[in-house]
Amino acid sequence: AHCRFITKDWLQKLDELNLSPNGIYCCGCEPFNDKMDFSYLVKAKGLGARFNRDNKLTILNPKWNPSSSVDATKIFDTEIILGANYISSKKWWDKIGGHHGFRRNLREEAFLSIKTRMAGGLVQCIPFIITAHKFRKKPPFTTSPINAAYNELAIIYICANDLFPEYVKLEKEYRGNDIVNEVLLQMDSNMYELETERQRIKKIAIKSFEESLYI
């Protein structure tokens, strides 16, 4: 209900691209305002995303690629897919485990992109297929720092288990002991799923977590 394709023949164009099934792809995104009308499109445009390298923790919370930084006429590699408008083949989705091990929809762009690159797949943006996206000032659901911390630590547990103690410490410094201790209890109760996903990525990975952060 909050997205519209601006590119009217998007499905035909997508089919003609003959994309590799071993990857995950996003398209361009233009936000539009409260009038829900394409004639009111604002100027900002996102074409894929990149890791926020301010520090080790924010790296899991991506930033948009500004349209001025890329060639919008051809498909290009991007560090992270842009949320709300990405696709993959079902075979690839199942291979990397999709959203298994995650809570709701926080940090999933980084999660899927990291796992894809670790497994040797493509992470790309198709900039000439555009969706318009209604970005709300406030989401219609309750967000929780526990869910964000859970997903950030789940990424590390599954994709970079040796760094898990370090990231627990970083989360405690950022969010406080009470929140992170609750997250650790919840992770412990979900350990079968988390460990299953960790073993999945360990089996298919040809790159390390650190290598997956760079194109």
Residue ranges, per PLM feature:
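A recurrent flexible, glycine/aromatic-enriched loop bordering the glycosyltransferase active site
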Residues: 58-59, 64-87, 146-147
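Active-site donor/metal-binding and catalytic loop motifs
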Residues: 126-142
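Amphipathic alpha-helical interaction motifs in eukaryotic regulatory proteins
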Residues: 11, 15, 94, 114-117, ...
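Alpha-helix capping and helix-loop boundary segments enriched in small/acidic/polar residues
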Residues: 2-5, 100-107, 139-143
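Terminal low-complexity segments of carbohydrate-biosynthetic enzymes
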Residues: 82-83, 144-215
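Conserved donor NDP-sugar-binding/catalytic core segment of glycosyltransferases
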Residues: 3-55
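Amphipathic alpha-helical segments in well-structured domains
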Residues: 7, 11, 109-110, 145-152
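Donor nucleotide-sugar recognition loop
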Residues: 80-82, 90, 94-125, 129-131
